[in-house]
């Protein structure tokens, strides 16, 4: 095996240290040439114009720290004394669409080797990979021992990419791939036209009109100004309107707290815990050292003691009232006969003048004017869509009742 070439005090060729030393040497040589050119310009003698790789003449008055490229940006075959601004320009060798990785390229069209080469894959005979990385079917007798049907080398692309192109998420994207999606959509539209006939396509104006119609329909579902709110329909004092669920709740179901929210009554252990919390808060407000969370046992004992004291005070008050007025068993209830005045001949209840009963309706009930035996509104005529009396089918509210004659006359008119 041949040893790597060494230069400059035994440094290997291609090492970073060697490149740095060569760059320093080139800079020194370039500096000497730059001094010679400067002396020639002072003496008024002509000098050879400096050109770049593209043949453009460079400005000789460009500072050296700008025109000289760093050692890591210089190519091996460049003139070390040449000054150029190419290293400051945008890299034109960046990978483009045609310089991308080979996709789906078949090796069958490439030239195959005729004999096994040293260092090639022992399975297929390609030089670009080893046996452990081979993607071909494992052969019973490898290509190393039987040079039959050797495979060509893999197509390895090495596109030159800059720092930005390596981190570009769309780098390598081929817009032609989206054409397949467009073709699928076009095929679907053609099939729909065949199924639904050759109907004209909907224009943009028609689509906009359809959207406006949908918006107009949705606006009709809005609440009218004449609508009455739910909490105004039932003004019963025994019910409470819950704004959260928009329903009415009775006092048996819960109550409204200080924040205006509906709180449902608890049962079982939850009710006991709520009562215990209420007692603990009340005692804490009075200055007693009762804390439900810090010492729940002491709080429970104190709550039990407070309940017993309240029951004892209630029993003492009840006994005092019984001693003063007697027990409930000895209290005589006022007879029902004394609640109203009844005459012997015609038993009618005489009430006070200011007594008002529960009004069922604002209209007068059981009033039969005009010799009618039924009330107004007991009959409905479907043909004329009017209300009337059921006794004579009269549709005039102030009309006089004619009995069965009115029904017969109405029936004869319907038959005609």
Swiss-Prot record:
The keyword Nucleus applies. Its main location: nucleus. Residues 18-45, 86-113 have a biased composition (Basic and acidic residues). GO terms for biological process: mRNA splicing, via spliceosome; RNA splicing. Signal peptide: none annotated. Pfam families: Slu7 (PF11708). It is found in: Nucleus. A zinc finger (CCHC-type) spans 119-136. Keywords: Metal-binding, mRNA processing, mRNA splicing, Nucleus, Spliceosome, Zinc, Zinc-finger. Transmembrane segments: none annotated. The keyword Zinc applies. GO terms for cellular component: spliceosomal complex. One of its GO terms (molecular function) is pre-mRNA 3'-splice site binding. Associated with the spliceosome. Involved in pre-mRNA splicing. Belongs to the SLU7 family. This is Pre-mRNA-splicing factor SLU7. The gene is SLU7.
């Amino acid at each position: 095996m041949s040893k790597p070439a060494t230069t400059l005090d035994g440094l290997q060729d291609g090492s970073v240290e060697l490149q740095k030393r060569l760059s320093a040497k080139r800079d020194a040589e370039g500096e000497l040439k730059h001094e010679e050119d400067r002396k020639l310009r002072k003496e008024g003698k002509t000098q050879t114009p400096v050109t770049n790789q593209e043949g453009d003449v460079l400005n000789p008055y460009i500072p050296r720290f700008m025109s000289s490229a760093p050692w890591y940006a210089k190519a091996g075959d460049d003139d070390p004394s040449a000054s150029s601004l190419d290293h400051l320009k945008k890299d034109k060798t960046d990978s483009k669409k045609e310089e991308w990785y080979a996709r789906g390229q078949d090796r069958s069209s490439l030239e195959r080797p005729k004999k096994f080469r040293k260092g090639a894959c022992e399975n297929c005979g390609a030089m670009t990979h080893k046996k452990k990385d081979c993607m071909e079917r494992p052969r019973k007798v490898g290509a190393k021992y039987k040079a039959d049907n050797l495979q060509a080398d893999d197509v390895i692309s090495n596109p030159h990419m800059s720092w930005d192109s390596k981190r570009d998420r769309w780098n390598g994207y081929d817009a032609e791939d989206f054409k397949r999606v467009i073709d699928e959509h076009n095929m679907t539209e053609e099939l729909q036209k065949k199924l639904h006939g050759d109907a004209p396509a909907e224009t943009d104006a028609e689509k906009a009109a359809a959207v406006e119609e949908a918006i107009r329909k949705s606006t009709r579902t809005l609440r009218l100004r004449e609508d009455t709110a739910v909490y105004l329909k039932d003004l019963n004092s025994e019910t409470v309107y819950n704004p959260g669920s928009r329903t009415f709740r009775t006092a048996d179901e819960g109550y409204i707290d200080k924040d205006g929210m509906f709180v449902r009554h608890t049962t079982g252990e939850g009710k006991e815990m709520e009562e215990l919390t209420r007692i603990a808060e009340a005692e804490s407000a009075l200055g007693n050292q009762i804390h439900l969370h810090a010492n729940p046992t002491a709080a429970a004992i104190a709550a039990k003691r407070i309940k017993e004291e309240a029951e004892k005070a209630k029993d003492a008050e009840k006994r005092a009232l019984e001693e003063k007025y007697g027990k409930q068993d000895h209290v005589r209830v006022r007879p029902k006969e004394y609640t109203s005045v009844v005459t012997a001949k015609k038993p009618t209840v005489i009430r006070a003048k200011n007594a008002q009963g529960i009004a069922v309706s604002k209209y007068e009930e059981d009033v039969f004017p005009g010799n009618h035996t039924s009330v107004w509104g007991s009959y409905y005529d479907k043909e004329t869509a009017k209300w009337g009396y059921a006794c004579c089918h009269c549709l005039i509210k102030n009309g006089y009742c004619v009995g069965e004659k009115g029904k017969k006359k109405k029936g004869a008119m319907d038959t005609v």
